Structure formats: structure tokens, C-alpha cells
Amino acid sequence: MRGERGSKPSVYSLFFDGVLTRTDPERAHHGAFRAIRAARPVLASRRTPGEQVTALGLTFPNVLGLAAGFDKNAVGIDALAALGFGHVEIGTVTGEPQPGNPKPRLFRLPEDRAIVNRMGFNNDGAEVVARRLAERSRGRDRLGHRSRPVLGVNIGKSKVVPDDDQAAVEADYEKSARLLAPYADYLVVNVSSPNTPGLRNLQAVEKLRPLLEHVRRTADAVTRTRVPLLVKIAPDLADEDVLGVADLALAIGLDGIIATNTTISRAGLRTPADRVGEIGAGGLSGRPLTGRALEVLRLLRERVGPDLTLVGVGGISTVQDARDRLTAGADLLQAYSAFVYEGPLWPRRIVRGVA
């Protein structure tokens, strides 16, 4: 939380250590997000930093995006972009609205600069989010064309849908794709969150292939311009399964892979074991994920060559982390946990550092 590791603490770092660490993490998230949205009129005048990147057939203002999970319901896209993110990925959005798992469900591990979450895809549902995106689109049309962030829409399985009913799973993702693809610059199929029972089973190639093909057909049916489709995978996949997903992506003409989601591993943490045990289940994000996320990215790039867009995410905290991910083959980067720990100036610092 010191910007680059070992540098002087920032004002935000001191505030985080002194105040936010004593506040319930989910409450702090909502408070910070409200503040960001309120500051949008001031932030909107700032030029987006960094150099443009072409990927997925799209022009991104810069290489760094905000990963799904921060803005689940598409309520602060443009305010977040004004902080310096070149793309914002909303969601995960499910076909049906759902409250998510019982609270508490979000935990900080400050010693590891990590977060554990078991949110459970709490969101307003595809119908409500689609209406919100439609309203945003109409508002932008009224104001005339202006520079904007690239918008990713991340869709996942509703908890009420059994993972062993392939037809029901496909119908659930179809609903989200049908409603949301018209507003997405790119679409992401999330099959890798550990917080929806059975979801990760859908990463098996025999289940993943028909699902991705079904979402592709659905998106094509409701859009005039082809919307790029990506899949987000877990760091906990065995290497051979990572390669299997890579081969599948090439075989069916997927546009890209996001690597990686959170991990269920707790290996190598500095946080005391009793505290980790007390927190319990959930996906771990942040600095401990850096090594494995980098490994998965390298595996993917070696397998797919230049043919797919790869988005590197997981444990990117410093400019050097970002450079390492780009060197390993990432076309784009995403972050979440470091943004929470480092504060609103962090995106611009990373973008300028890799430019």
C-alpha cells in the first residue's frame, strides 16, 4: 500500500491504515464508491492518461482496466473511468437478481495486501442492469459523442440454476447475453468464481464448449456488430486444464481469455493462520496471487501465440508487476485489490509507469 514497494506512504495509505481498516470492508466499499460517483463532475475534465491500445478489434484509451466485481450493477462506469482506467468491466451480472451470500462476506488481509470475498454474485440481475445501460447510452447520445471507456460486461450463473443441468445453465447465460450484449463493447463468460456452488465445474471443456458457443450465438443474434467474447478462468486450474481451455478458445474462435480470477489457495500468506481460518471460505485476490496469475498467463500465451487477446489480472500492485504481465504476453491489464489498497491515484500511476 505504499505505491511502489518500499516508497514513502501516501496520504491515502495513511488514511487506509488509520481509518478504513477499522471499517467494515463492504461498508467502506460502498462509501468509497459513492464518493467516486459524487466526484465525477470534477474528475470528468481530466484527460485519460497513457497510450492507446488496440485489442479485440477495439481501441482502448490505455492498457489498464478495472476488473469485474467493483461496479457490479453499472452505476459508476464513467466516474471510475475518470480515475484513469481505460476500460471498466461491470458485473458479474446474473440472469436473475440475487442478494449474494450472507454477511460478512468481504475481508481484508492487510499483511498480505489481499482481499477474501465470498460475495456470491450479489447483483440487480440482467434486466435491471440492461435498463441502466440503456439509459446511460441514451444520455451519452444526447450529449453527443465523447471519449469513453471501453465497457466490458461480465456474466455469470444464477445461484438458483443447478450446474448439472446444462440446458438450464445455457438458458440462464442466454438471458444475460441477450439483454446485455447490445450495450457491451466486449462480453465475458465467468465460470471461475469460487463463490457460486458448482460454477467452476463449468470450466471443464466438455461443459464449457457448448456454453460458450451458445452465448456466442445469442450475442450475434441481438447485435449488429459482432461483440468480442472472452472467458475468465481460475488460477487453480491444473496446467493441463489451462492449456485445454486455450485449445478450446482457438477451436471455437473465442476472442480472448482473462487470466485469472481469485484463488481458493491460502498458501504462503503472512496473515496468521488462525485469522485466515476464522475468515473461512472465499476467493483470495491481491498480492499473493501474483506468481500463479503470471504463470497462467505465460502458459496461455505460449499456447495461443498471437491469435487471442489475453487480459492479465491478479496481484498487479506495482508498475513492475504491470510490466511483468505485459512482458509475459498480456495485451491488456486489469486490477481490483490494489485499487482498494492504493487509492484513487493508483490507476494513473500505473498507466504512466508502463507508458
UniProtKB/Swiss-Prot annotation:
Q: Which reactions is this enzyme annotated as catalysing?
A: (S)-dihydroorotate + a quinone = orotate + a quinol
- Positions contributing to substrate binding: K72, N117, R118, M119, G120, F121, N190, N195, N261, T262
Where in the cell is the protein located? Cell membrane
Q: Name one GO molecular function term.
A: dihydroorotate dehydrogenase (quinone) activity
Q: Which InterPro entries match?
A: Aldolase_TIM, DHO_dehydrogenase, Dihydroorotate_DH_1_2, Dihydroorotate_DH_2, Dihydroorotate_DH_cat, Dihydroorotate_DH_CS
Which UniProt keyword terms apply here?
Cell membrane, Flavoprotein, FMN, Membrane, Oxidoreductase, Pyrimidine biosynthesis
The top EC class is oxidoreductase
Q: What is an example of a Pfam family matching this protein?
A: DHO_dh
Q: Name one GO biological process term.
A: 'de novo' UMP biosynthetic process
Q: Which family does it belong to?
A: Belongs to the dihydroorotate dehydrogenase family. Type 2 subfamily.
Q: Which NCBIfam families match?
A: PRK05286.2-1, PRK05286.2-5, pyrD_sub2
Question: What name does this protein carry?
Answer: Dihydroorotate dehydrogenase (quinone)
The organism of origin for this protein: Nocardioides sp. (strain ATCC BAA-499 / JS614)
Q: Which gene encodes it?
A: pyrD
